[in-house]
Amino acid sequence: MSEFSQTVPELVAWARKNDFSISLPVDRLSFLLAVATLNGERLDGEMSEGELVDAFRHVSDAFEQTSETIGVRANNAINDMVRQRLLNRFTSEQAEGNAIYRLTPLGIGITDYYIRQREFSTLRLSMQLSIVAGELKRAADAAEEGGDEFHWHRNVYAPLKYSVAEIFDSIDLTQRLMDEQQQQVKDDIAQLLNKDWRAAISSCELLLSETSGTLRELQDTLEAAGDKLQANLLRIQDATMTHDDLHFVDRLVFDLQSKLDRIISWGQQSIDLWIGYDRHVHKFIRTAIDMDKNRVFAQRLRQSVQTYFDEPWALTYANADRLLDMRDEEMALRDEEVTGELPEDLEYEEFNKIREQLAAIIEEQLAVYKTRQVPLDLGLVVREYLSQYPRARHFDVARIVIDQAVRLGVAQADFTGLPAKWQPINDYGAKVQAHVIDKY
C-alpha cells in the first residue's frame, strides 16, 4: 500500500487531536451510497439540502421507517455525516438556508469501495497497466539520460511516486476486493447447498466458473505485462547505481518491484487456492449424490414396507459367492502325501531348491528347439512334462515350463491379434492358451 511519512505515534496523536471517528450503521451507509449515486449523475458534483432529504426519504422508505419525522431524521443524518467528514457543507450570506454539499475524499473513498470497485474489468486493468508501462518507459529513458537533482525529481521520482505507485495500489485494492468476492461466493454456495442442493448444482457451477474465469483473466493480464514492467524498473535501478545521492529513487524502485512481485504472486496463489476450493465443492456434491441415492432407496423401502398389505410385493436379492484367489507366487508344494514315486534325494528338500533343479533340467531340454529352429507347441510340451509328475505338482511344473519356454522366443501369431485355441494339458481339465513359438 502507500508509504506513510509519519510515524505511528504521530498518526495516533493526530487522529486523537482531530477527534476522528466513523460510525455508519446500515441505514446511514445506505444513505451515503444513495448520495454518491445521485451525485455521480450531476455534472457539477454538488447537491442541495433538499436533494439530500429526498435521498434520505428513499432510504427511509426502503427500511420501512416512519415518514412523520423524516425531516428531523434527515437533518440529523446530514449533520452527522458533516461531523464525520463524509460531507462538506458550504453556505453563503446571499443564499442563507440553502447550503451546498459535496462529498469529501473520505466519503468518495467509502462509496467508491462499495460501488465502483465492486465490478472487475479486464479492460480497466489493461488500461491501468498500459498507463503504468508508458510512465515506466518514460522514467527509464529519463534515468538513462541523467541530469541534475531537479531532473531526477521531476522526470523519474515524481512519475514513479504519484502515478505508478498509485496504480499499483489500485491493482492491489482490486485483488483484495476479489478476495472478498471469493468469500461472498463461498457463502452463496454454502447457502445454496444447505437448501436444495440438487437445484443448486447449476448455480454452484456458474458461480465457480465465473470466479475462476475472473481470477484467470486478472492473472493473465498481470503476467503479460509483468516482465516489461520489471525490465523498465531494472533499467532505472541500473541508472541509479552510479549516483550516491539517489537513494530515494533506488528505494522507491525497490518498493515498486516488491509490490509488483507481491501482486503477481498473490494472483497465482489465489488461483491455486480457488482451484482447491472448487475441487472440494465438487467432491462434496459427488458425496451428497451418493448419499442421496442411499436415502432415496431407504425411503422407498420404508414406504413399501408400510404399504405392504395394500400393495404386496416380493423382494428378490442375489448373493454371489465371493471369488477367492488361491494362487500364491511363493506357495510351496503341498505337504500332504501324494501318490507317485519321488526320488529319495528330493523327498525332504524345499520347493525352491526343487524348482531350481527342474528349471535347469527343463531349460536344457527346451534349448533343443531353439538350436534346431523347431516350432515349440506349448500345449504338447506342457502335457508331456505333466504326465511325468503327480497331479499335486502340475500347476508348479506347468508354470516352470511356460516360464522357460517364453524366454526362448515369441510366437509370430501373437502379433495378429487373434486368440489362440485352448489345449488340454492333463486329464483333470487343465488347459493352456498359447500360440506356437516359432521365432527365437
UniProtKB/Swiss-Prot annotation:
GO terms for biological process: cell division; chromosome condensation; chromosome segregation; DNA replication. Residues 208-236 are annotated as: Leucine-zipper. InterPro entries: Chromosome_partition_MukF, MukF_C, MukF_C_sf, MukF_M, MukF_M_sp, MukF_WHTH, WH-like_DNA-bd_sf, WH_DNA-bd_sf. It comes from the Bacteria. Keywords: Calcium, Cell cycle, Cell division, Chromosome partition, Cytoplasm, DNA condensation. GO terms for molecular function: calcium ion binding. It holds the Pfam family MukF_C. It is found in: Cytoplasm, Nucleoid. GO terms for cellular component: cytoplasm; nucleoid. Involved in chromosome condensation, segregation and cell cycle progression. May participate in facilitating chromosome segregation by condensation DNA from both sides of a centrally located replisome during cell division. Not required for mini-F plasmid partitioning. Probably acts via its interaction with MukB and MukE. Overexpression results in anucleate cells. It has a calcium binding activity. Belongs to the MukF family. Interacts, and probably forms a ternary complex, with MukE and MukB via its C-terminal region. The complex formation is stimulated by calcium or magnesium. It is required for an interaction between MukE and MukB. This is Chromosome partition protein MukF. It comes from Escherichia coli O9:H4 (strain HS).
